Amino acid sequence: DGVVWRTADTPENSAAFSRPAGRNGIGGYPQVRMVCLMELSSHLINASAFDSENVSEMRLAAQLAERTPDMSITLFDKGFYSLGLLHHWQMSGEKRHWLLPLKKNTQYEVVRKLGRGDELVKLKTSPQARKQWPALPEWFTARLLTRTV
């Protein structure tokens, strides 16, 4: 998950971190964006990445992929829906899986049904995503689990 903090208004922080633009120009304090990889049951932070607030959570999360254990499943919140990030995540090690809520209006093609509420699907990646994530293929295969809550 991600968080943004204000830092002390010092010349050092101003040089290192950006200030968000507001209606009246530049914001009051330099800000830091941080993304954490947290163990689910204990909420202990296993890894974190931080940078200026103008760096996206997706870019910071990508830095955490190499620090994720093999044979694991990572739960993302819906704000992390990026096929580039998800492909990078699973390709960064052995049997690295991910789970996140499906965004509304996500377009996919069913490859085959695996069971009730369980399908193998193909997701088409955009040219923009492939430009940002050079290893991203044109089509991305994923398992889609659907549940009624």
Regions found by a protein language model. Give the residues of each.
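Single, function-defining residue in the core of a domain
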Residues: G2-A15, A21-V149
